[in-house]
C-alpha cells in the first residue's frame, strides 16, 4: 500500500471543519453554556472532598491491617 494512501485519512482529520452551505442552517442544534466557575456548588465540593478524605483514611487503615496480618502469618512479628 502506498504511503500517500495511508496519509490521506490523516490529512482529512487535520483539515479544518467545513461550514454548511447557504441552504443549511449555520445555527447550532445544541445549546452550550459556560460553566459557573464564579459560583461553585459548595455542597458538591464538600461531598467530593469528604469522600476523598474518607477513602484515603480507609485505604491507609486497610493497608496497615494487611501489613500486620502479613507479618503475623510469616512469623515476622
Curated annotation (Swiss-Prot):
Localization: Mitochondrion inner membrane
Transmembrane segments: 42-60
InterPro entries reported for this sequence: NDUFC1
Transit peptide: first to last position: 1-28
Membrane topology of this protein: Single-pass membrane protein
Alphabetic keyword roster: Electron transport, Membrane, Mitochondrion, Mitochondrion inner membrane, Respiratory chain, Transit peptide, Transmembrane, Transmembrane helix, Transport
GO cellular component terms attached to this protein's record: mitochondrial inner membrane; respiratory chain complex I
Transport as UniProt keyword: yes
Electron transport as UniProt keyword: yes
Function: Accessory subunit of the mitochondrial membrane respiratory chain NADH dehydrogenase (Complex I), that is believed not to be involved in catalysis. Complex I functions in the transfer of electrons from NADH to the respiratory chain. The immediate electron acceptor for the enzyme is believed to be ubiquinone.
Subunit structure: Complex I is composed of 45 different subunits.
Family to which this protein belongs: Belongs to the complex I NDUFC1 subunit family.
Protein name, per record: NADH dehydrogenase [ubiquinone] 1 subunit C1, mitochondrial
The gene coding this protein: NDUFC1
Amino acid at each position: 500500500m502506498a504511503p500517500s494512501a495511508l496519509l490521506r485519512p490523516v490529512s482529512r482529520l487535520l483539515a479544518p471543519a467545513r461550514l454548511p452551505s447557504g441552504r443549511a442552517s449555520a445555527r447550532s442544534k445544541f445549546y452550550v453554556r459556560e460553566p459557573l466557575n464564579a459560583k461553585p456548588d459548595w455542597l458538591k465540593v464538600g461531598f467530593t472532598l469528604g469522600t476523598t478524605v474518607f477513602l484515603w483514611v480507609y485505604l491507609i487503615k486497610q493497608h496497615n491491617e494487611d501489613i500486620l496480618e502479613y507479618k503475623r502469618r510469616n512469623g515476622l512479628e
